[in-house]
Structures are given as structure tokens and as C-alpha cells.
Amino acid sequence: MPSSTPPALFPTLYLASQSPRRQELLQQIGVRFELLLPRPDEDAEALEAELPGEAADAYVRRVTIAKAEAARARLVASGKPASPVLVADTTVTIDGAILGKPANADDALSMLTRLAGREHAVLTAVAVIDADGELLPPALSRSSVRFAPASRDAYARYVESGEPFGKAGAYAIQGRAAEFIERIDGSHSGIMGLPLFETAALLRAARVAF
């Protein structure tokens, strides 16, 4: 007679992200995790290079899967115990262009002035590789954000705060940039970098306890 014992749940997962926001969001829903970050010899930024003519949704999905596969290989090489691996990537798009992390202050100011008074899309893809090494179908969260008109000086002061650096589109919705945001339509957590509804569904499928 087949056993009716349910599969064991994993008490923790591996989070392959340095983002404090993603860590805070996982903690918000009670997920326990261990960081699984790139080694010094890994070129993590190379995974984020755009392909010619690549659409934003295809880009963010491809990058997320590539990061997940790299993280899984890192886990296997480390000899750590098997457990699901979570990866996410966020990008901002407007007029068909992908706005990643600004390279410098001028780049950040250029991005922000481009967003001023307009609506743009924020895409976050989430991928989970289960403890057996299988990639679950990635999830994609798409939200719209409208920036109110603001002066170039206002954006320049925001850039001087340092907050735009390391953020797709050169802003953080949970930070000082909130003063520029007129409205959003979609997932607030997705705009922050980890859509919790989609993430929770993937973690349940991977048998993560939370």
C-alpha cells in the first residue's frame, strides 16, 4: 500500500541575491533563508548584458534563469546540503528601452528625467530551482508606475542622496523616490524586487516551509 506520508518540507532556502529589499520581503512572509552569493571569480554582471533587440520581458526572464542556474552550480560546488534556490531580477522599461542599474550619477539623472511625468513598467522575474535541481516554471510580475512631473534639480538632489545606485531605473519605491510616484498599478513588492504572491506560490511548489 502506498505511503500517505507527505513529502518533507525544507525549513530554509538559498537566496542568491545581495538585495536587502528581497531579504526583508522574504522575512515579511516568514521565509528562512541562507545567502548564496557569487564567488569572487564569478562575473555576475556579465549575466545582465542585454541581447540586441531583446524585449524587456524576455530579457528579465532570461537573466533570472541564468542567475538561477549559476546559483545552483555554486551550491553543488560548495557541498552544502540540498535545498531550493531562489533568484529574482528586476528591470524597468519605457519606450521599449530597458533601464537597468545606472552606471554613474549622469546616467541616473538621465533615467529619472526620462521617467518624469510618464508611466513606465517594472518587470520582476522570479525563479526557483528545487532541491532536486529542477527549475520550476519562472513567474513574471508586471506593474505600472507613474512618476509625477518634477524639476531636474529635484532629481539631481535625489541622485546626490546615493539611493538610485544599484537600483533598476535609478529609484527605490520604498525610499525617497516615493515623493515622485503619483500612482502604481500592480504589485508593490514586485516593484521593490520580489513579488510575494508569485514567490509564495513557487516556494510552496518547491516544498519550502513558511
From Swiss-Prot:
From the record, give the cysteines joined by S-S bonds.
none
Task: Tell me which family the UniProt entry assigns to this protein.
Answer: Belongs to the Maf family. YhdE subfamily.
Enzyme class of the recorded protein, top EC level: hydrolase
GO MF annotations, alphabetized: dTTP diphosphatase activity; UTP diphosphatase activity
Question: Could you name the active-site residues?
Answer: D89 (proton acceptor)
Cofactor(s) in the UniProt record:
a divalent metal cation
Q: What is the name of the protein in this document? A: dTTP/UTP pyrophosphatase
GO CC annotations, alphabetized: cytoplasm
The task this protein performs is described as: Nucleoside triphosphate pyrophosphatase that hydrolyzes dTTP and UTP. May have a dual role in cell division arrest and in preventing the incorporation of modified nucleotides into cellular nucleic acids.
Lineage of this protein's species?
Bacteria, Pseudomonadati, Pseudomonadota, Betaproteobacteria, Burkholderiales
Q: Which organism is it from?
A: Burkholderia lata (strain ATCC 17760 / DSM 23089 / LMG 22485 / NCIMB 9086 / R18194 / 383)
Q: Which InterPro entries does the entry link to?
A: ITPase-like_fam, Maf-like
Which PANTHER family does the protein's record reference?
BIFUNCTIONAL DTTP/UTP PYROPHOSPHATASE/METHYLTRANSFERASE PROTEIN-RELATED, BIFUNCTIONAL DTTP_UTP PYROPHOSPHATASE_METHYLTRANSFERASE PROTEIN-RELATED
List residue numbers at the site (Important for substrate specificity): R21, T90, Q174
Identify the SUPFAM superfamilies for this entry.
ITPase-like (SSF52972)
Q: What are its E.C. numbers?
A: 3.6.1.9
Quickly give the catalysed reaction: dTTP + H2O = dTMP + diphosphate + H(+); UTP + H2O = UMP + diphosphate + H(+)
Keywords attached to this entry:
Cytoplasm, Hydrolase, Nucleotide metabolism
Q: Where located?
A: Cytoplasm
Q: Which Pfam families match?
A: Maf (PF02545)
Gene Ontology biological-process entries = nucleotide metabolic process
